[in-house]
Amino acid sequence: MKNLTHLQRLEAEAIHVFREVAATFSNPVMLYSVGKDSSVMLHLAMKAFYPAPPPFPFLHVDTTWKFREMIEFRDAQAREKGFELLVHVNEQGVRDGIGPFTHGSNVHTHIMKTVGLRQALDKYRFDAAFGGARRDEEKSRAKERIFSFRNAQHGWDPKNQRPEMWKIYNTRVSKGESIRVFPLSNWTELDIWQYILQENIPIVPLYFAARRPVVERDGMLIMVDDDRMKLRPGEQVENRLVRFRTLGCYPLTGAIPSSAANLSDIVEEMLIARTSERQGRAIDRDEAGSMEKKKREGYF
């Protein structure tokens, strides 16, 4: 038997996880946020069940504040790959006018993402949900299992999780409970980019450097993606050469100065990077809005 490369081992582990969930859960779903990790997850899911399509739908929780290029890419991928795409919006949040500019990152994220996700999981009665989180991203994710148990309220209790020895997973849940499943847990950001390069996986163009209209605000370069973003006194829109390491709601996602215009350039950039990709996410900036608190409330 030939020795597997590092990326082949990661790929094999992820495919095993996909198949384990398909075999043991009655109604799984994949959370499709449209970022680079979701693109890798989609690719792995297609591989895991080829030539059949993935035996589960793909769910996008739309906050109505995603980059326009993300939504265009999402719809194009669904048409091209032929997977079942479910889009859920927290309509009550929309009626209440919840948004990142009017209510801040914490309230917006909780209402439009966390509550929206809980609504969708309850509506369709999913008992397992794939997510693209990785342990290298953030400290609370570093201690999360691949099969992350959630209670009937979708909450995560890090003290009430199950051992995962020898890649044997406990998939039993009672009525109303569910499991969040993270096939990319052991991948790093560099692994993701090297795999995207190796497999030639399509990704949102925002990951590549280009001249974009940005405003420097609260220590971040925020892209002006539509007319809902109002300038503060003294702010000016500049066309700067930037790209994004992570994607989310555009008012809460900071760009980085970069000239990496192709996948090889991005991999080279990652080899010397000394900061986390999460530095560009406003929702991780303070303790009150910490990732662990959000996950306990039912966040991804």
Curated annotation (Swiss-Prot):
SUPFAM superfamilies: Adenine nucleotide alpha hydrolases-like
CDD domains: Sulfate_adenylyltransferase_2 (cd23946)
Record InterPro entries: PAPS_reduct_dom, Rossmann-like_a/b/a_fold, SO4_adenylTrfase_ssu, Sulfate_adenylyltrnsfr_sub2
GO BP terms in the entry: hydrogen sulfide biosynthetic process; sulfate assimilation
Keywords: ATP-binding, Nucleotide-binding, Nucleotidyltransferase, Transferase
UniProt EC number: 2.7.7.4
Known catalytic reactions: sulfate + ATP + H(+) = adenosine 5'-phosphosulfate + diphosphate
Pathway note: Sulfur metabolism; hydrogen sulfide biosynthesis; sulfite from sulfate: step 1/3
Pfam family membership, one: PAPS_reduct
Enzyme class (EC, first level): transferase
Molecular function (Gene Ontology), one example: ATP binding
Parts of the chain that traverse the membrane: none
Family: Belongs to the PAPS reductase family. CysD subfamily.
Function description: With CysN forms the ATP sulfurylase (ATPS) that catalyzes the adenylation of sulfate producing adenosine 5'-phosphosulfate (APS) and diphosphate, the first enzymatic step in sulfur assimilation pathway. APS synthesis involves the formation of a high-energy phosphoric-sulfuric acid anhydride bond driven by GTP hydrolysis by CysN coupled to ATP hydrolysis by CysD.
Protein name (Swiss-Prot/TrEMBL): Sulfate adenylyltransferase subunit 2
